[in-house]
């Protein structure tokens, strides 16, 4: 890119062109400016090339450039006076031609032409004219580009033979610069005017903006005539200008000429390395030629500076310019060489002046990084005036040297750093401060340059203050690799270690980038890509076994600490870090040692690192390496850890060094990581790289070359673990990567994505305590448990679900561990039982034990989980019953695999993994374990969905739906298992099971316990509170369910809060009872947990009903009105249907029903309590009788046991019997309530129950679904909402064989459901009426305590009630039940008293319900504009119903 007119023209044309106005006064236009001069030697420099390829190219394409493309046509534009006023016309067309013809001898000339062009425009035109505005815009772009121009001008010419040093450099130049030189030489551009060089160097004052300060340097370098042979081969790429700039200013220093005597051998040795590193070496050599263009010195022209006149020219503009530049370059190369490679050491001869101690060297490297940072683009806006020596001539500052006796600039400082003229950092700081002092001294305080100096000084002082006190490692070994990657953009702090090398490299790279960058870059990229591929392969190989390394525990400890700081990073990185903690401290500064191509590859990597920010990024190899950390410029990192780099090599080499291919693959893999996992990557790097400890975790610039092998291996392990997890679940479920992407986005609408994000985030973020189990789950699970332990469950699952199980299990383990100690042990129920407890011991030990119990307690069910397909529990339970109880997981597992959304098994997984606990819980969890064990594939998805609970937090978009989905999933295992909801829930029941049962049972309990904390309680705190409260052994299951939901509750709380806002206080008063009930329900079928939760919540609601009975009843009634018809019907036919083929529907419409379930689940929860109290008998008849009828099949004890259905639960198991015992109070209260309610609405309740039984009767073998049926009550309500939805949803998602079988059942159930819905609607009306009467009485007694809670519920319920009118009707129907149920639920023992109380408060309740309904209607109307998840779920349910 040309400089512009010749020196003469430049001087002549101070403002020759204004706008493209006519150039001729009137009749003619003068001849255009000269574009070629055969008498002038053609010269091409890196800066001229930059001006042509970058500056002119960008300006030419600018939208405002068209007026300047050609000389002003004064005739055409009718500007007769233009050429009278403008004596030196100039235009971009002329400049372009001059650049292309190598007319300019220095970039300063071209810049002068540009300035003349702009000045002419400003002179001839009025200030506000459009052409002036266009010119200003163009000038701004021009100045911006110029600020990025290489600071040192290096001649690029075919005459490369000058200088002995050049002898070796010639090959270098030929390799790097040669190609560039040849093309340049071929084109007129290469012509450098050796004669003119002095003139250009004088730097005709740029008429343009002062941004030309770099120009002086360019001019100095522009002394090509003598130097052309010298290798001013390739200034850093024009893009690299910023960093390279520093070289330019230093080039001007007079000392350089003296240093010019560069030992030819050194330079000779240097060239090859130089080429690879960058064209900078020539620049270094230029000092040899002294002022004569560092080029000649670079080229190893005689150490005697043949181009002394250059020095004179340079020195005239600025003493420091000419002198400094040459020595700097010369020394720069040597400094680089010793650091990077032996070849570079050639230039070391110049470094001889001072041999600082390792500490000083490290600090000087850091200083070099600071300089680099100051040359970075981010500071260019205010740093550009300091890039080069003050151009006194160009700027017309004739008194400058009178006032400023010791001029200083960044280029001079950089050159001095590179030539090792500084013995310690303080000397460097003194020069930098001198530069700023000169600025403050010469310029007035209000001058813009002073403001810019202050800004830049702030940057410098901050960076300098952070300089490491102690050398991290010898800079010689590690810096070389580091320097390469740390081109211009490397963080100055990090580049300190390699700063001198880095700066020289950056300058050389920028210089040579244009010449050799293309060819060498392609070669380097190819090599790097190959190396990265090899690295990637190694990483893949290493990543698999690495998890089992013995160091894992140590890493876990470290990781745990790290996880606390960076929960989002992910467990695997911590594990990886644990594997190689000592190596981490050691920088990977010796990539060269690692690779057979240490020097070349290092250079490549260095350029990759350094250039990758600029040019390497595009190449596949280097950019990937840099990509992982976008701003990583390890060069500077190494610079910071230059001393440490060598030590790091020693230690790092202990670990197998990474090949460039491996590094490339690692960078690619890091780029694949979701955003939430990158924190871990940064943490690993910072924890293992002392030089990066203080770096900004949000933005780190590192070069893989500077990282210690141990750090790289740790990163490799972590990334591979993350990607493996992603990919494994991705196969069965949508794709772990996609999931992780969703995870990264924080959107876990997909259970798959939720599982993914849950796995990573729940591990790290769910709980500090959980983080350890998570890590163990991942590390141990992957390694030790990879086989069969809870953490290993993922691997066991892999066998079950070959592709996703391993990853998902690990993910599940992570969340399960946080949520439940047992979830990790899902896959192998027995082993997992132990593992989960162990894993969960830290965060959730009690739960872990309880969770373990379910597996054992699930003897019938627990075996089933492992043998879900086999239906081992089928013995106790009919095949259908068993499949749903124990096969819920089985069927859901396919469905879950098919559709991530329906991963209720995940909750079951949580419940299941804790089989070792009491049988009661085992009973409740029994079904979840079946889900977990029965369907490892399902578990994978459940596990993924267990991560999904964390996603629930991420699923705020579906406040009710997502939260419940997430929580229900943790809880869904119980719910699903009990009713086979897992299989049938996907459309509605699964969702309800997951959402409502979980909210009902676990969430209500959770809310009751948590409500004082109200949704604020964290899963851990929730679990802790529940655990602290577990009164009976059975309670742990409730706690487990709550804990399962503890991760889930925040999302679920909205729905459940609606149902339970009033309950929390009452429930807390009787947490034991409610917990027992919930626990027993869970014990009866923790998988039933959701349904049981619904029932338990009713029980709990009943328990708390005395205080919040009216509110709960009203809210529940409203919910019942919304959900009751469908829910009851769905309960009736869905229970049977779900039991028969729960997984099809559940699996088919997991996502859609999830929403409906979510919104319906609260209402269903309410309905169940309503049914419990108002028609407890009805509910029991509905649920217990229907569930028996539906579960007419021998329901497995684990599946069947429900506290609500004592008959069923009794047959189930002792734990279940206990649950029954605990539940009996609930049931007793319900029966009492039932009797009281039945007095009025018993027929309706019974009819409804009959209807439910009728639909469920077909699935009578599904006795296991007693508990499920209760959950199914809500689930069935959803199914009934979409009468065909449950069956249809179940069909679609069920296993193929299950789908067929369920399809037939669903058809029957649909018909029954339709009938049941009609009957239920009538029954609900009767119930509502009766309940209203009872509720009024109850409300009178309960109204005071209930009202406070009622308001939140009203607010929450309106959301639930808003969506579907059917839901409103259901709620209305259920409301009648709820008043009765609420009292009975509030106090199972108080049920009889509450019956009268409910009758007493019936009027109050009715009034309150009427108020609530009206309020809800108004709220619904107000909320009509908002998206109601409940409504959407209803729509989905209806849609699914229509599908079948």
UniProtKB/Swiss-Prot annotation:
Q: Where is this region: BID region?
A: 538-610
Source organism, top-level taxon: Eukaryota
Q: Where is the composition biased (Pro residues)?
A: 206-216
Coarse class of the protein's main subcellular location:
nucleus
A Pfam entry, by short name: BRD4_CDT
Q: In which tissues is it expressed?
A: Widely expressed.
Question: What keywords were assigned to this record?
Answer: Bromodomain, Chromatin regulator, Chromosome, Nucleus, Repeat, Transcription, Transcription regulation
Where is the region Disordered? Answer: 1-44, 154-217, 279-362, 492-523, 540-645, 722-986, 1020-1422
Site positions (Acetylated histone binding): 125, 443
Ranges for domain Bromo come to 43-149, 358-467
What ranges does the record list as Polar residues composition bias? 186-196, 303-319, 1090-1109, 1151-1163
**Where is composition skewed (Basic residues) in this entry?**
549-569
Query: InterPro entries in the record, alphabetically?
Result: BRD4_CDT, Bromo_Brdt_I, Bromo_Brdt_II, Bromo_chromatin_reader, Bromodomain, Bromodomain-like_sf, Bromodomain_CS, NET_dom
Q: Where is this region: C-terminal (CTD) region?
A: 1126-1444
Q: Where in the cell is it found?
A: Nucleus; Chromosome
Q: Where is the composition biased (Low complexity)?
A: 11-27, 498-511, 746-760, 800-823, 919-954, 1036-1046, 1110-1121, 1282-1296, 1367-1389
Q: Where is this region: NPS region?
A: 498-517
Mark out the compositionally biased spans (Basic and acidic residues). 327-347, 1246-1255, 1298-1357, 1405-1422
- A single cellular component GO annotation: condensed chromosome
Name all NET domain ranges.
633-730
GO MF terms held by the record = histone binding; lysine-acetylated histone binding; p53 binding
Q: Name one GO biological process term.
A: regulation of DNA-templated transcription
Spell out the family assignment given in the record's similarity comment.
Answer: Belongs to the BET family.
So what does this one do? Chromatin reader protein that recognizes and binds acetylated histones and plays a key role in transmission of epigenetic memory across cell divisions and transcription regulation. Remains associated with acetylated chromatin throughout the entire cell cycle and provides epigenetic memory for postmitotic G1 gene transcription by preserving acetylated chromatin status and maintaining high-order chromatin structure. During interphase, plays a key role in regulating the transcription of signal-inducible genes by associating with the P-TEFb complex and recruiting it to promoters.
- Please provide the record's free-text comment about the domains of this protein: The 2 bromo domains mediate specific binding to acetylated histones. The exact combination of modified histone tails required to recruit brd4 to target genes is still unclear. The first bromo domain has high affinity for acetylated histone H4 tail, whereas the second bromo domain recognizes multiply acetylated marks in histone H3.
What name does the UniProt record give this protein? Bromodomain-containing protein 4
Q: Which organism is it from?
A: Danio rerio (Zebrafish)
Identify the gene encoding this protein: brd4
